Amino acid sequence: MSFQLTLECADSGGALDSPRDPKRRRATLAAALQILLIAMLIVLGTSSCFDRQKKTSTSTTREVVDEAGRHVQLATHIDRIVSLAPNLTEIVYAVGAGEHLVGDTEYCDYPAAAKNVAKIGDTIHPSIERIMALKPQVVLVSTASQLEAFTKQLDEQKIAVYVTNPRSLEEVFRSIETLGDLFGHHDGAASLVTDMRARSFTVEVAMRSVRPVRVFYQVSGEPLYTIGRESYLTDLVRRAGGTSVTADVPGAFPRYSDEAALAARPEAIILPSGGSMGTANSTPAAALKNSPAVLNNRVYKINDDHLSRPGPRLIDGLEEMARALHPGAFK
């Protein structure tokens, strides 16, 4: 816009008014000046808006909402990550951000490179002092680790904490995509999730013609723990052609009574065992010894690392569970 042109038009007595009428000429000039003022305000306002956008785009921090609904201030470029759960460590490596992992737990043993990362203790009792010494820009926490109090301590130390809490396979996919974006590895995360979705779909197709099997998922036998309606594993059992007999039990990993287990009469029992668990949880609980699952020899051991870690290898667990429950569907 040319301010000079506007004033010249007003002063020349063109089509807007007659130069022989002083009153009309003054009115026209006043109108032109008003237009000029408005135009200047618009330009100044636009400039201010651009300045604000520029400040935002060049800011060193950004606000995100984690899976616990918490507002978290994160660095725009994350170069130092600490992971407090094996599944999160696996995700960091799988999306291509492994070089930025500066600390993890003693249980983080996959991939092999994770074993060489500085250890900050175990999942339940990590060391705040060790974490602070590593100067992370973000600490990744899984709610499955029951670290609410610890998360509060980190917040008090002004260390950013990002919590994940997937309750289904689909939410695991979203967790991977979100973490990939946060770490600047969108393409790596997208490629990984595309592959996982394709494998999940193959299982889905195979399960379309099967009758769902009543499944008891034994997290531990003594004391007896299982999966509830808030666990991603309840969704995984369904996708593998089963129906968890504890799907309506509140919580993610509830304690379960022997009486309830006896009354459930599952057709199959899943025992997450092996892997980092070793031989633990390798036999059904005593309360299940007379269940149809035990009597019909339908007790299946599946690598615990493929089930208890909601990350890239969860698809391995899905495939293994589906093949155990419905071997004929994959011939």
Locations of regions flagged by a protein language model:
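Bacterial N-terminal signal peptides
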Residues: 34-45
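Bacterial signal peptide processing site
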Residues: 50-52
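A short, structured surface patch at a secondary-structure boundary
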Residues: 61, 80-145, 150, 245, ...
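Extracytoplasmic substrate-binding proteins
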Residues: 70-71, 137-138, 148-225, 246-248, ...
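Short secondary-structure boundary segments
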Residues: 85, 143-144, 219, 249, ...
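His/Asp/Glu-enriched short active-site or ligand-binding loop at hydrolase and phosphoryl-transfer sites
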Residues: 105, 230-253, 273, 298-301
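Short helices/loops that flank or line small-molecule/ion binding pockets
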Residues: 128-135, 157, 256-265
